[in-house]
Amino acid sequence: MKLAITIILVMLSVCYSSDTCPGFLQVLEYLFMGSESTYEAALKFYNPGSDLQNSGMQLKKLVDTLPEKTRVNIVKLSEIILTSNLCNQDPSF
């Protein structure tokens, strides 16, 4: 569970910009709300190689153990962060 939360936070730290793949938010939505097969297909689109594909599927299995409300809220939070004008600024936490 700690690993899943850590990976989620790392993914959320990527801000939406011209350097960020437009499909990133869609892949996140499949991770949190899609079926395993839908998420797997989204990963395969990017040709990650078998080790990365397997790691992504392990992450999906961990994420699927979270309550649905938590997963929905993580997607909403991701959308807010990735589409925020603040993403263009250097965060000083």
Curated annotation (Swiss-Prot):
It comes from the Eukaryota. The keyword Signal applies. Binds phosphatidylcholine, phosphatidylinositol, polychlorinated biphenyls (PCB) and weakly progesterone, potent inhibitor of phospholipase A2. Antiparallel homodimer; disulfide-linked. Interaction with LMBR1L is controversial. GO terms for cellular component: cytoplasm; extracellular space. Keywords: Disulfide bond, Phospholipase A2 inhibitor, Secreted, Signal. Its main location: secreted. One of its GO terms (biological process) is signal transduction. Residues 1-17 form the signal peptide. GO terms for molecular function: phospholipase A2 inhibitor activity. Pfam families: Uteroglobin. The gene is SCGB1A1. This is Uteroglobin. Belongs to the secretoglobin family. It is found in: Secreted. CDD domains: Secretoglobin.
